[in-house]
Amino acid sequence: MIITTHKQFPNYKRYEIEYEGRPLVMETGKLAELCNSAVLVSYGETTVLVTCTASARPKDGVDYFPLSVDFNEKLYAVGRIPGSFMRREGKPSLPAVLASRLIDRPMRPLFPSDLRNDVIIACEVLSVDRDCSPEITAMIGASAAVSISDVPFNGPIAGIVLGWDGEKYLFNPTQEQRKTNRMTTTIAATHKKIVMIESEADQVPDDVMYEGIVQAHAHLQPVLDLIDKMVSEIGKP
């Protein structure tokens, strides 16, 4: 684990670990300082800015938790410029909407059931490495951003993609490995338990799936430990 600071930004912190063969870096204190918290997370060459903002007072007249998770894709993240006359981005794509739900699902139950303040988690994709999932990167960043904020949260969580090629398990498989993949399972978990599983598979035996989930949970622990380290050093009360 590597932790560094910056002279020009007194609140700047940089945390780095190796996650499934690729560097996972989380930086705070440099961007979006007016939010409750902000984390710039990079996994390989994939970079996502995640911000967490909460209202100061509970929202009137609601009997639910008003949480919004926005996963914003930009064409410049893959080196393209919109070709339309207006040069504007369109509405969120279906994969972006599904990515927002992927992050929302494991996090929502970990907030207090009586919380009525507006909470917005915005994930802005800045660059994409096709070997490193921006959805998983955003999920880790969202967990870190909420954990170090002053919003009550019973986390952290971390995410991983579990694959299987018929012989061995693949954790956060690369684009080349996904070509022979017989199973793609996205798993989110806390230190103690699995909180979300989303899977598509081609006739994978139950025992293979179960053992893969157990191993994936173990592979998540370094990321959770890193977020705990961030909370202990820069977390808001």
Predicted regions and their residues:
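Short, Gly/Pro- and small/polar-rich lid/capping loops
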Residues: M1-E33, A38-V39
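Catalytic cores of large soluble enzymes that bind and process phosphate-bearing ligands
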Residues: K7, Y15-E16, P23, G61, ...
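Glycine-rich, flexible beta-strand/loop modules in the N-terminal catalytic cores of phosphate-handling
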Residues: P23, C35-I120, V125-S127, C132, ...
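Small-residue-enriched alpha-helical segments and adjacent helix-cap loops
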Residues: P82, M86-R88, L98, L102, ...
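Feature captures eukaryotic membrane-trafficking machinery centered on endolysosomal pathways
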Residues: I136-A145
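Mobile "lid/hinge" segments at catalytic clefts and subdomain interfaces of large enzymes
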Residues: P152-P237
